Amino acid sequence: MRSGEGSTAAAAAAEEEKVKVAAPFRLAELGLRVCAVPLAVASVWEMATNKQVDETYGEVRFSDLSGFRYLVWINAITAAYSVASILLSSCRFITRFDWLIFLLDQASAYLLLTSASAAAEVVYLAREGDREVSWGEVCSYFGRFCGAATVSVALNAAALLCFMALSLISAFRVFTKFNPPSQSNSKQQLSQEQGKPVVSG
């Protein structure tokens, strides 16, 4: 009877310790999600409103380039997800879906990384050109367009850093749910493997 009470008390103490450890991470997680929203929205706004007209070379818009369109869509999706996760963070039932939050944070970080890479490549080609395929740089003619695109990519990168940190925090929260094997269980398993009877204290 005492053994059962002791194991229950130990489990309760372990659970209380988990709550104490996780509390600061909850605050950091909320702060990162709040920061990610304006960064992603600003990236969308900066890119979606980006256009410039040149008397000689005509008009260029973000929608003319697939890498920029991809960045806009991904940032819009991650901003919406961040808002939803902030609103749901106050609900107790959300802890049941920690695995889902973990996977969504990982997916958001990956998508932001791919969108940053795609858009950064377009910006680089616009600024430097590609001599191997005889592409000239265009930022000397569309400087304002290139500048706004660069700002949008930088904001996207900042949102990416937020989600990279969120991925680590959500992973920590998920995997701390698993208790390490107790000493008594380890002794019992070892005794069974050696074929010896288990003597309980």
Swiss-Prot record:
Cytoplasmic-side positions: 1-26, 92-98, 170-201
Keyword set, alphabetical order: Cell membrane, Membrane, Transmembrane, Transmembrane helix
Residues in compartment: Extracellular: 48-70, 120-148
Polar residues composition bias: residue spans: 180-194
Annotated Gene Ontology cellular component terms: plasma membrane
Disulfide bonds: none
Cytoplasm is among the record's keywords: no
Locations listed in the record: Cell membrane
Membrane topology classification: Multi-pass membrane protein
Subunit description: Homodimer and heterodimers.
Protein name: CASP-like protein 2D1
Organism the protein comes from: Oryza sativa subsp. japonica (Rice)
